[in-house]
Design a protein with these regions (language model features):
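Conserved anion/nucleotide-ligand pocket segment
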Residues: 152-215
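Substrate-binding/catalytic subdomain of NAD(P)-dependent oxidoreductase enzymes
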Residues: 208-241
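Beta-loop-alpha module in the N-terminal Rossmann-like domain of NAD(P)-dependent dehydrogenases
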Residues: 79-111
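Active-site-proximal loop->helix
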Residues: 17-26, 45-46, 127-142, 158-161
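Rossmann-fold dehydrogenase core element
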Residues: 134-152, 167-169
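N-terminal Rossmann-like dinucleotide-binding module
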Residues: 1-55
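Glycine-rich nucleotide/cofactor/substrate-binding loop typically near the N-terminus or early
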Residues: 32-88
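Rossmann-fold NAD(P)-binding glycine/threonine-rich loop
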Residues: 66, 103-115, 124-143
Length: 241
């Protein structure tokens, strides 16, 4: 049976990668709902291609443009945070893929967990801001939370099936755009330089957070909540490759 997916943040880099996987595996997955913050044009194109049941645009000012773009379809169009909460709790959804950016991802995760949905989580701020609440809530509702961002997904896969306790977790780190800069050089770097990641093409926020290493701090916190490992047993390894 196909897994019915609500994809939050479908127009961002992780959302687009998720749709690539769905496109390549039509027998395994189907899209029921797509959401975006304000990129209504891409959202409309995606909704038509994947024959989504509904779409949500978080920025209510874009609602009219999105509704008009989908006027000739049967796709239901919603806007705002409350609509986001309602679609993730729909009985037509099996898996919620949370690819939202920032704190905006927290409340949809909570709503999905309360409905007992499986959450494929790429939004690290959910656990950075609310891990102490979200993880016990997920356990209470028997709602699996599966990390899909690179480092935590790798750790999750390594630990699956293992019965011995975890002694230590190592989170890898590319080092970002400034990994070879001295402290003195860092005083004069620009936004444009920070956005030139040496390895990956990502959204602006995650690229900046990578350059400042704030992202890696978030990932240590995320690993703590996901795997129940104390922070003192989580280390970071610079691995430019």
């Amino acid at each position: 049976m196909k897994q019915r997916i609500a994809l939050l943040g479908s127009t961002g880099s992780i959302g687009i990668q998720t749709l690539d996987i769905v496109r390549e595996n039509p027998g395994l997955f189907e899209i029921t709902t797509l959401t975006a913050h304000r990129n209504w044009e891409r959202l409309a194109r995606q909704a038509v291609e994947f024959d989504a049941d509904s779409v949500v645009i978080a920025d209510e000012r874009r609602y009219d443009a999105l509704r008009q773009a989908l006027d000739d379809t049967s796709i239901k169009v919603y806007a705002g945070e409350e609509a986001l909460r309602q679609v993730v709790q729909s009985g037509q959804v099996d898996v919620v893929v949370n690819a939202l950016v920032g704190y905006a991802g927290l409340m949809p995760t909570i709503a999905a967990v309360e409905a007992g949905k499986k959450v494929a989580l790429a939004n690290k701020e959910t656990l950075v801001a609310g891990g102490c609440y979200v993880m016990p809530l997920a356990a209470r509702h028997k709602a699996p939370i599966v990390p899909i961002d690179s480092e935590h997904s790798a750790i999750f896969q390594c630990l699956t099936g293992e019965k011995s306790p975890v002694r230590r977790l190592i989170v890898t780190c590319s080092g970002g755009a400034f990994r070879d800069r001295s402290r003195e050089e860092l005083a004069h770097v620009t936004v444009e330089q920070a956005l030139k990641h040496p390895q990956w093409r990502m959204g602006d926020k995650i690229t900046i957070d990578s350059a400042t290493l704030v992202n890696k701090g978030f990932e240590v916190i995320e690993a703590h909540w996901l795997f129940g490992t104390p922070a003192e047993r989580i280390s970071v390894l610079l691995h430019p490759q």
